């Protein structure tokens, strides 16, 4: 393990866990490590839904990765139905496991596909959340070794301008 850490492997991949908004998530090299920046997004989303007093919101988490966003929303809103999508089957499997260990699996739907491709056309949501790949391709090599050499490129690379997902 010391050798792994010295080679730049993130501590979270070595231990296999990362805390996110008070919940524990299993992480592996198939998913990004949940970060504090994403907690800001989730905290804002929680505030919006609570202010609107939605009792059973339908929430979509696109590019779910570890499931940190969707699982946290399901945990925060016990009557919510949360749909999580990811293009990576390995990431989706990790999200499923995290939904199970955080006791929200039965209220979550998992769909594999790229962005909205996985969503049935008639499905509607009260809130859509996403932390898609947004780093410009040319910038990735300037990131820390922990990120550029160990986190999944699929989850980082947002194309030439960082907006590949939103431009499509």
Question: Which residue ranges define each predicted feature?
Answer:
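A general structural signal for well-ordered alpha-helical segments in protein cores
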Residues: 8-11, 66, 70, 153, ...
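Conserved SAM/SAH cofactor-binding pocket of Class I
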Residues: 40-142
